[in-house]
Amino acid sequence: MYAAVEHGPVLCSDSNILCLSWKGRVPKSEKEKPVCRRRYYEEGWLATGNGRGVVGVTFTSSHCRRDRSTPQRINFNLRGHNSEVVLVRWNEPYQKLATCDADGGIFVWIQYEGRWSVELVNDRGAQVSDFTWSHDGTQALISYRDGFVLVGSVSGQRHWSSEINLESQITCGIWTPDDQQVLFGTADGQVIVMDCHGRMLAHVLLHESDGILSMSWNYPIFLVEDSSESDTDSDDYSPPQDGPAAYPIPVQNTKPLLTVSFTSGDISLMNNYDDLSPTVIRSGLKEVVAQWCTQGDLLAVAGMEQQAQLSELPNGPLLKSAMVKFYNVRGEHIFTLDTLVQRPIISICWGHRDSRLLMASGPALYVVRVEHRVSSLQLLCQQAIASTLREDKDVNKLTLPPRLCSYLSTAFIPTIKPPIPDPNNMRDFVSYPSAGNERLHCTMKRTEDDPEVGGPCYTLYLEYLGGLVPILKGRRISKLRPEFVIMDPRTDSKSDEIYGNSLISTVIDSCNCSDSSDIELSDDWAAKKSPKISRSSKSPKLPRISIEARKSPKLPRAAQEISRSPRLPMRKPSMGSPSLTRREFPFEDITQHNYLAQVTSNIWGTKFKIVGLAAFLPTNLGAVIYKTSLLHLQPRQMTIYLPEVRKISMDYINLPVFNPNVFSEDEDDLPVTGASGVPENNPPCTVNIPIAPIHSSAQALSPTQSIGLVQSLLANQNVQLDVLTNQTTAVGSAEHAGDAATQYPVSSRYSNPGQVIFGGVEMGRIIQNPPQLPLPPPPPPPPQAPMQLSAVDHGDRDHEHLQKSAKALRPVPQLAAEGDAVVFSAPQEVQVAKMNPPPPYPGTIPAAPTTAAPPPPLPPPQPPVDVCLKKGDFSLYPTAAHYQPPLGYERITTFDSSGNVEEVCRPRTRMLCSQNTYTLPGPGSSATLRLTATEKKVPQPCTSATLNRLTVPRYSIPTGDPPPYPEIASQLAQGRSAAQRLDNSLIHATLRRNNREVALKMAQLADSSRAPLQPLAKPKGGAAGAVAQLPARPPPALYTCSQCSGAGPSSQSGAALAHAISTSPLASQSSYNLLSPPDTSRDRTDYVNSAFTEDEALSQHCQLEKPLRHPPLPEAAVTMKRPPPYQWDPMLGEDVWVPQERTAQPTVPNPLKLSPLMLGQGQHLDVARVPFVPPKSPSSPTATFPTGYGMGMPYPGSYNNPSLPGVQAPCSPKDALSQAQFAQQESAVVLQPAYPPSLSYCTLPPTYPGSSTCSSVQLPPIALHPWNSYSTCPPMQNTQGTLPPKPHLVVEKPLVSPPPAELQSHMGTEVMVETADNFQEVLSLTESPVPQRTEKFGKKNRKRLDSRAEEGSVQAITEGKVKKDARTLSDFNSLISSPRLGREKKKVKSQKDQLKSKKLNKTNEFQDSSESEPELFISGDELMNQSQGSKKGWKSKRSLRTASELEEFKCRKASEKEDGRLGSQGFVYVMANKQPLWNEATQVYQLDFGGRVTQESAKNFQIELEGRQVMQFGRIDGNAYILDFQYPFSAVQAFAVALANVTQRLK
């Protein structure tokens, strides 16, 4: 045989585990019984009793398969005993659990409908020595130390009892195998025998000097009917090579053996109690615990090795480790397992049909895997390698065949799932929601106020193995208001060892201490540097994060001075509380504390905001609003706004992605916004929290400020912007050569709040170099929104620079001016389109609504851009520049119209975008693009696109669908033209085949120009019809390449946002817009391909899509050169990845906004030709482009522009939707002749989570509707001569701008457009540029836009096929976020309703300024709208999600899992508490807490989402509460909500 302790972290409770009992899973129905029982032994439940009087019931499994689903709840902590639990005994036949405590209390527990309750209670007041169930489970034998014995039925009826008068105590009692007799062992070595009716039969002395510790039979504990003896007849049988998983054949014993353990360590094996010649085992162990396996062939004897000299025992080093010896039925020693355990083994039990031996030693629980047969060489090798590797993740480093790697990895699959998946990564565990339906059951305890700390401390514990594992600690920081900070559990390195052997003794020692000491222990563990260590920051010292005069349009002077640390909080001297000076909270203090989050509140304690303070968390973590009835006669109402938080892969970026949020006080009283300038010293207010640009017409930062701010933000991101340092940005004007870097002076002040503060360069200025696109600024935004390019000089054209992220791919691209024209200074091609890419990703910040003063239309001069895009050089296409991804994330601080400060972290690479367009290039592109510079960076795509990859988090998409975003590939494509190149060869090859078809079709379409486009649009199948396809399957098409606009003049065709969508029958699948601007370099196309290639993995997924996505992309002739029809710029393409289709419904309108894809007029045409122009008809580009765009603009019909007609036709598939929507949205404005190209660029709202360049996972969750509400800036037309951009149209209404986005989305993008809008909104919540966008518009403007767009476009879309299409796109949409969808459905109601909901949102918004977007909580009116529009925003989401939406949601979930939780931040969930029922009898309100809550309290509450409970909180003791929660709550968010509630003064 073979036995080995399981690899992995040590499992431990918070107190000594005193007893164990295991039972197998029971068939749920009669139908399951015929199946092999082995299945039931593979899963089971372990009961533990501990020193705190808590019984733990924990799920265990031995199948070593990660794909098996587990129960929603895998641990129960059963409270009720008043002293330590000394015995636990399962009754398997009746599924009951008996537990006994040291005071003699006996509870019999039974589980019903998921909850455990006490069925029987027996308390005689005397200590229980043993409790045993009969083998058939019908009777219980209870023996007391004082000699009293009792036999009763399983239902609690007493059969008989007897008093045995002895001089010694009874130590154990057991049933004989036939249940006809009972045997009792005594402390003086005697055995007493009685029959089942209580008559005394015998009294035998077994040992004169040694007392009997325990007795047992090598016979199954329970006789459970076994329907099958075969090990292989179960459908999920796994071969014996699983080692310990293989089960032995039962031993057929002629006669059971009675095993008696003595205090000396000897064990006697007897045929019966009167056996005169027993087999004696001299174990050589002391404190022996012995138990036969279920099969009866193996006896495990555990104990401490006896020392030669007892005097040495006291010395720790001289203590020997505990050992487990295995013997057979003949008493022969078979195997010895040496453990590293240095404490006595208190209890052992077999489980999982003898393949596991569970041992308890102190608070630790060890699992031993046992192989009964001769161990195979494979098993020995597995154990040897596993013990060397120590971690599962190291298995993949070995050069072993997949089958062996899989086998080796089974050694690391735990039998008992640890409470924290990775003990060394507690931070992730508490910061992000658990996957799937896993529910966390926690206990929250309060410790006494500590004057040093300044307020009461609360610790959140995860219930596990009957104990509590501390995971978070929070403390109150204000005596005036209920405000708290939550500590980072990783502040102390020791926390990593919490489960390590080194700390076990500490944990144990503390276990038996009082609760307060326990909490202290956890405090130490959770935040070693916490309150006490940082005495400098005492109590209410923690300033609230707020800006002094929140209502003031200008930043407080102090804030300006400290613009470098926008996130640091400043206490507002108001309410009579003394203002804190910076000295009180030195910067070091904050870092010392390592706070995760802060809970702020208004003075009344009715509104709370949860602000993320850690760099890896979104700034906005949620809000809680309490509403009470008159006279407090009714239960209070809670509304929770909860943004979905997703993890960003640190592999790609170690920079935090933030949702733009306002870090401010409650809206009510102190509208304080965390200004960009909060004193650095201010504590936890997070130093590194980027503030989303809040652009309000009233406020703007000076270039210097903005630069400083950007610098500080970038510094945090490790992003270097050449421009940052200088007022003037050296913009690598993607000049014709693309080498030249032009410096643009930074305007002293951004004229428009919408301006993005990047590098302090004004977008308008930047645009100077390239012909400026006259983009009609959205009404709200100032005409000119300077876009700053984070990266000044793109001299590093090379991809490496791109990779650097430090630089924007192109300064201009960096510009994320709110709606500014794409002012790619160098690249004449308008990057606007590119910029348009929806800012779905948190990293992206749409420029403020301000549009750069419409720069002069980009003249044809743009063509030179082409030059600039040299193949190798090509560092930044306008496109690439557009995505200057290499930079990483830029954090921007802005103020919204209400004066709230918002920080947005957007991918470093930003494209200038028309005012109406959002700069967020591709979600991932911005950061990603860095790579683009050089193909040489091929591998870079992922790397450089730190964001990039994040942005593209790949969602699992139905196979039929194109990858929502070619994850990295598409992002990279967008973000990194060069990177694209990298992949391009692959993609090229992959796409080329399709591209050719598409190219031909495209060419034909292009030739037809618009006309073909229309047909194209219609034909979903043709590559050329990609455009048409877009409409057909717009979602994929939705991916608009923000980069499109960036295409160089020669790449103007490159601008082709040919939304790959339009190509290929997969149109629906191919949502990628291959907009890569055709660089002068053919590589561009290659890049596009490569971007896709990067997606290759996806590509299989999307291969169809790819061709579709990229068919017309041949970007101009140049692209054409890369015949792969998809010449879209991978960069662009990547961005495009986000399929708007998903958000097709309401999203479309916003996408239109995004749509502002601006290209030089020439570019515009080029773009048109872009994907659609077949290599052969580069000249067609314009026509093609229109065609492409036409296909891209389903709304053309709605657009006033006649030129769109062609497009319109193509849109027809989605036309109904988009057109109607657009029409409502004033599509006319949106659609501009130039727009189609823009459209084609389709901003690819980051709606598609994966697509978002921000790549902050947040995006995916984003609700689609938010995009809509965002109504990005009106699409900025490149006002290229080619298309009379009808800037006026765009300008006409911000609303209009959304339509353009829609246009972009049109190809199926419409949904996307809408999604984009929604996305943005969501993003805001999620740290996306959403707020930026809204802010760009100016809140009012945005509101108008949102409401109109939402009503019109959304409604239209919703009403039209949009809903249907959206559903079609739903895969993407769901990825993005269903909220949008929900909203769309709502929208279907009527514009008025929408408006109402909008108003509601605004009123209900958490933030003070009713005008401003919902305070970042919802990242946008839309969000609020959706959620608040009907306090059941989630309902709309839910309704939308029904059917296909539901599937999409599942898809998203699956993909999230695949991505390892990489993705975009999700949308904001709006939830309300469940109203309690009135109990007439007791005259109280009641809620059913499933037995978890034991005390009535007005603070008890339950939160529901879509009809299911996702959180419950209730009092169980004076200072203890239970807190149960599941997705979408993360531990930090749930804890914050609980803290807000604990101090709630309202009834």
Swiss-Prot record:
WD-type repeats, residues: 80-119, 123-162, 165-204
Biological process terms in GO annotation: protein ubiquitination
Modified residues (Asymmetric dimethylarginine): R949, R954
UniProt biased composition (Low complexity): 533-546
SUPFAM superfamilies, sorted: TNF-like, Tubby C-terminal domain-like, WD40 repeat-like
UniProt KW keywords: Cytoplasm, Methylation, Phosphoprotein, Repeat, Ubl conjugation pathway, WD repeat
Annotated SOCS box domain residues: 364-414
Phosphoprotein recorded as keyword: yes
Span list, region Disordered: 530-580, 1374-1414
Stored Pfam families: Beta-prop_WDR35_TULP_N, SOCS_box, Tub
Gene3D superfamilies: Tubby Protein, Chain A, YVTN repeat-like/Quinoprotein amine dehydrogenase
UniProt modified residues of type Phosphoserine: S577, S1347, S1378
InterPro entries from the UniProt entry: Beta-prop_WDR35_TULP_N, SOCS_box, Tubby-like_C, Tubby_C, Tumour_necrosis_fac-like_dom, WD40/YVTN_repeat-like_dom_sf, WD40_repeat_dom_sf, WD40_rpt
The protein's annotated pathway: Protein modification; protein ubiquitination
GO cellular component terms, semicolon-separated: cytoplasm
UniProt-annotated location(s): Cytoplasm
Taxonomic superkingdom: Eukaryota
Region (TUB), start-end ranges: 1436-1547
Assigned protein family: Belongs to the TUB family.
PANTHER family listed in its UniProt record: TUBBY-RELATED (PTHR16517), TUBBY-RELATED PROTEIN 4 (PTHR16517:SF2)
Free-text domain note: The SOCS box domain mediates the interaction with the Elongin BC complex, an adapter module in different E3 ubiquitin ligase complexes.
Function: May be a substrate-recognition component of a SCF-like ECS (Elongin-Cullin-SOCS-box protein) E3 ubiquitin ligase complex which mediates the ubiquitination and subsequent proteasomal degradation of target proteins.
UniProt protein name: Tubby-related protein 4
Organism in which the protein naturally occurs: Mus musculus (Mouse)
Gene from which the chain derives: Tulp4
